[in-house]
Amino acid sequence: MSSILPTLGKDVSIDIGSIQTRLMGGTRGTVISEPSIIATDTKQEKVVAVGDEAARLVLRMPDMWRPLTPLKDGFIVDYRVMHTMLNYFLNKVSNALRRARVLVGVPCGMTDVEQRAMMDAVIQAGAREVFLIERPVAAAIGCGAPIFEARGSMVIDIGGGTVDMGIVSLGGIVDSKTIRFGGSDINNALLRYVRECFGVIVSDEIIEDIKHTVGTAMAPLEDAEYAFQGRDMMNGLG
């Protein structure tokens, strides 16, 4: 990680999602992309790992380590976990952050209390200034939409826990709506479908691959084939 610090400059962007957190800076693009999760000891409730390492621990020994996430449906539900996770990620690039301006993508409709909690957590990690940007605006900028022109651009940002929709014009949001439904809900529906229709238990990785391989929101919808392996729910064979 030290090799990328000089290239981050004074501007850092963070996208804190229900499933994944990404940190971007300078010309290097994404420099951190890890699960939005911490792992605690089930007996002493001490934090033992964050991000990738936390996900690995929980997957290997779920009885020993308890997963905690700071967000539910895109909104903060545990400020302590949020503070711990942000400090971990931001401290990875602490040299760059000591005088950095940090831009944080947030859902539409975030309350003043939630906004202040987010800003306080980032500032306590060492940022000089913190700015919040609604995700539809950030997505519009990222895809090159003419957001500063006097015409509307409709943006739909589908995250793990929420769908943020906004009409962007003249540099701001004209109207917006957040639905507390996202990619993780689609995954859960696919998981139930595979279990009920085929009597098979499959991994989260396979479910994610099914979604990206055969899923579509574009007409015409066509049947697609997907071969997968799993564990039989009746006899446990895989």
Report the location of each language-model feature.
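Nucleotide/phosphate-binding catalytic cleft detector across ATP-hydrolyzing
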Residues: M1-I158, G166-G238
